[in-house]
Amino acid sequence: PGTYRPYDLGEEMGVWVNNSDGTTPAVGKAWPPGDSVFPDYTNPRTVEWWTQMCLEFKDVLDYDGIWIDMNEPSSFLRGQYPGCAVNDINNPPYVPSISDRSLAQKTLCPDSKTYLGAHYNTHSLFGWSQTAATF
């Protein structure tokens, strides 16, 4: 076991968004500067994990609300380690006119796996699914 309970329990429960292999957690860079994994709030196990973490925190600090601002899978990398594979889902024939013409710009690779499928199809559900789990 490590020294950070939310990570350790999340790893044990398998709650992270995974790389395209579907088993290895996607690791990106985020605040504070350093490696980050991303909870897959579409996974029922993640809802259990999130509930447990909120309850444990409430034992420490009796809060009456949670501000879940910036609840998107944000990464300072183009995708995550070791980078996005060269394939059609990561490099579709049409890409909107965005900063570097990459769907992985400041987020996870589109072929990353969530409980509901490819990140390409679930990216916009990330914040919504965290909100649903928090409510």
Which role does the model predict for each range below?
Residues 1-135:
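Catalytic-domain carbohydrate-binding cleft regions of carbohydrate-active enzymes
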